[in-house]
Amino acid sequence: MGLEEQLRLLPDRPGCYLFKDASGRIIYVGKARNLKNRVRQYFQSSRNLTAKVLAMVGQIVEIEHIVTDTETEALVLESNLIKKHKPKYNIRLRDDKHYPYLRLTLTEQWPRLVVARSMKKDGSRYFGPYTSSQAMWETMKLARRLFPLRTCNDPSRYPRGCLQYHIGRCLGPCLPDFDRHREYAEAVRDLQAFLEGRTQEVLERLRARMEQAAERLEFERAAELRDQIRAIEKVTEKQKIIAHTMVDLDVIAYARLYDEAGVQVFFVRQGKLVGRDQFLMSGADEMTGGEILAAFIQQHYSQTDFVPKEILVSEDLPDADVIAEWLSAKRGSRVALRCPKRGEKRALVEMVAQNAQEAMTERRQQRELELAATEGVLRELQAYLDLPRLPHRIECFDVSHVQGAEVVASMVVFEGGRPKKSDYRRFKMKVDQNNDFANMAEAVGRRFRRGLAERAAQVEGRVRDLEEGRVAEGGAEYGGKFADFPDLLIIDGGKGQLSYARAVMRELGVDHIPTFGLAKENELLCTEDRPDWIELPRGSQALFLLQRIRDEAHRFAITYHRKLHRRASTHSRLDDVPGIGPKRKKALLQHFGSLKAIREASVEEVAQVPGITLELAERVKEALGGPMR
């Protein structure tokens, strides 16, 4: 079906649209109040489209759409689809999956505060993400000092109380005669409020409890509460007052750097600045400031539980009313989303914007220093090895096995002196398991055969683009990771491995790529063009870079080899039976206890296991042997 026909079939309804290229990959996800009108705008006139959007439109061959009941639902769906598919042309939060959270385990009998690497829908309360692990651990340390919740995984292991209990940092739910259930529940509630920045609320509750304890003549308990109040007051005294009303709000501003945007968020709770975070957004080139902030708000607040009553932004947002409606639904009460133009709040926004600009300036300077240092190392390496061009892309191959078993090879890639892990590849050897030289040749051959095939696909894609009137740039999308050839190829090994690798490269017509062997024993390099070994100066940055690349290839190969070895060590004859997957295998072993018991059972007895038909039972018995009846 052609694009014109696909456009004609779009409904006049709210929803999300997904643009796909010729390979079926989703390259952009968007939302719309009216799908037909919004999507048609991309194809009606190119005058108002940026170069980036034009390039994207030139690659679209299929349009998929999902209808929703409201525009707010479309906004939520768009955020989820972007996170799932990571489309090339959408602006996205970078590396959010690496940011840690603090997790309050509310579903456990005795909740505790722990570190989590991702959010799950498990009934826990998550705080974060924390872009600084140091800030996260400082918050954890403070919370554990102020609120005496358990820190152990299994309270039953400490019937006499753990160390934290004996030093007054835990109420001791592990004790058999523990009777402070109410106090523990109050500590959990206070910790949650404290981490949300509602310290004044916590202090008011603690003061009320202290007075009640004193009235009941529980002076020891009153003293504990007094000390807790003083500790919290000491912490909050250090927090800067930036609003003269007891208000909870987030203040968000951004600054640009190349195709990135740095978004700065200041967290104000009850009028005091309790923290700030810096986030990076990729794909921000040609996006307006409002579009950057809107994308950030959607993605950031979809990952966090707490939404403040008010959010201030440095620029007006597109679809601000829809975003505010979504935030309000998430919070459970009205959220004000504002771009202040004057007054105290405008000054606050400008202060955050200034911080964002300073952070990105620092990032630019750091990047320039790193680039200058890296280019110097690469030029040094180019001179030592007499390379025709700067080795921007370096690939390294390593083979790993134990006595010829589970032979694997790895290919690691460094670009600009840094690992490019998205281009790493692993190969399970298929030919000669006991010949290191042949294994290296197989890995190198498979890499370049795939690369040549992808380059051919690129050419075909460009020709098809030109014939169909699409943007020629789109042809590049038909290739894969192997289509980029290295400026320098390193073989982990000596002249034998190098010779076999070069032979297969000549056969494929890629022997123009400079290739060197790097011996482990003495860190010497060899190449076909020189009879003698090449020794780089000890302590040189060029040698250090090659060692780092070689060690990374070895690590990557060893990791894969161990994975295969573990899989082989847990392999059973049941794994070879068609129709028996992990669940049915588990059911059989749980029912009979061992393979021997299954072998001795009859077909009818095996068929009594849930999920096992009579036909499957016969297959199992044929594979394992033993009596059929």
Curated annotation (Swiss-Prot):
Q: Which organism is it from?
A: Symbiobacterium thermophilum (strain DSM 24528 / JCM 14929 / IAM 14863 / T)
What's the protein name? UvrABC system protein C
What start and end residues bound the annotated signal peptide? none
PROSITE patterns to which the protein is assigned, alphabetical: GIY_YIG, UVR, UVRC
The record's GO CC annotations read: cytoplasm; excinuclease repair complex
- Give a yes or no for keyword DNA repair in this entry: yes
Function field: The UvrABC repair system catalyzes the recognition and processing of DNA lesions. UvrC both incises the 5' and 3' sides of the lesion. The N-terminal half is responsible for the 3' incision and the C-terminal half is responsible for the 5' incision.
The main location class comes to cytoplasm
Domain UVR: start-end pairs: 200-235
Q: Name one GO molecular function term.
A: DNA binding
